[in-house]
């Protein structure tokens, strides 16, 4: 008979091994495991995102990796009918799921696009702001993605990145700041502890 402690230790080791493998092999959270992105987000709350992003009516915002729309509906409300929110994801199922929620809430200012964040299909200076929450670490070529984000941001546009410790692809604040600086994005503010924060950068 297996003792409870032994079983618990085995499960813990399996979870740790999976997390380490996932960290060494960056990839998007599969749609079949979407419960991870639908869970409550300590530290990186919707209200804190709004405080850091400071979205305004009429703005054009790009959300990369919306998951199942945890932040999407609030972003769409914030920019209003005069604004536009584009959600961008490598997985069509995530986009479809989010757009169903958008329809249920009667929003008409959200547009989905499928693609790779290292090759954004948008003209230069397209957006007032770009948002990524627990997404940057899932992109194998992070430097290329940040360069693309800088390209599509209007001069003075904002990039807001959210990170949460415990995510297998967690990006520590210091590392994030260095990567953004190398891409030409200047750090402005951080809200939240280093274990869970939003950071804003300016193009």
Predicted feature locations:
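Class I SAM-dependent methyltransferase SAM/SAH-binding core
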Residues: 62-119
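A short glycine-rich, Lys/Arg-flanked "PGG" loop and its adjoining helix->strand segment in the class I
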Residues: 76, 143-158
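A short acidic, Gly/Pro-enriched loop at the edge of an enzyme's catalytic core
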Residues: 118-130
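A short SAM/SAH-binding and catalytic strip from SAM-dependent methyltransferases
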Residues: 128-141
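Core SAM-dependent methyltransferase catalytic element
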Residues: 192-203
